[in-house]
Regions:
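Cys-nucleophile CN-hydrolase/nitrilase-fold catalytic domain and related Cys-dependent amidase chemistry
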Residues: 17, 26-104
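Short, acidic/polar
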Residues: 19-30, 150-157
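Extreme N-terminal starter segment of soluble prokaryotic enzymes
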Residues: 1-7
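Active-site catalytic loop in hydrolytic enzyme cores
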Residues: 62, 89-157
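Short polar catalytic/cofactor-binding loops
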Residues: 9-14
């Protein structure tokens, strides 16, 4: 079963949340010209890494803005989206979280990065997630890991 993936890279503007959300919307729209089955976004595209502002103040509160954007886009354009990851604030803690949506705009996967890269002090910015996620996109079994998590293959075994 062949699937067309569009993987989006972007110049994330650290601390400029409004710019980043606007830019992601533009890039999502542009990617439709490739007729993708699945669109994948980059890590921490909403805030960038190591923002100088206090991360808790600019992170997406409970992921609401990101979830609304991705769900609406997926449904309106009949495309699966793996939302890279965004900084999400929950109860005064920030997680590096990925959301996956099917073509109907339904949230089918949510995963928060479990292993921060401590030499880069990620663990000082983000709390670790506690569970893996497994979901299907167009009948294909999928799971999400984020960056350094790939060093822990037991997450997807």
């Amino acid at each position: 079963m062949k699937k067309r993936l569009t993987i989006i890279q972007m110049d994330v503007h650290v601390n400029d949340v409004e710019y980043n959300y606007t830019r992601v919307q533009e890039l999502l729209s542009q990617s439709l010209s490739e007729c993708p089955d699945i669109i994948v976004l980059p890590e921490t595209w909403n805030t960038g890494f190591y923002p100088s502002k206090e991360l808790i103040n600019i992170a997406d509160r409970n992921g609401e803005r990101t979830k609304s954007l991705l769900s609406t886009f997926a449904k309106e354009h009949n495309v699966n989206i793996v939302g890279g990851s965004v900084a999400v604030a929950k109860n005064d803690v920030v997680f590096n979280t990925s959301y996956a949506y099917n073509r109907e705009g339904t949230l089918v996967g949510e995963y928060s990065k479990m292993h921060g890269f401590s030499p880069a002090k990620e663990d000082q910015y983000f709390a670790g997630g506690t569970h893996t996620t497994h979901f299907e996109l167009d009948g294909i079994p999928c799971s999400t890991v984020i960056c350094y998590d790939i060093r822990f293959p037991e997450l997807v075994r």
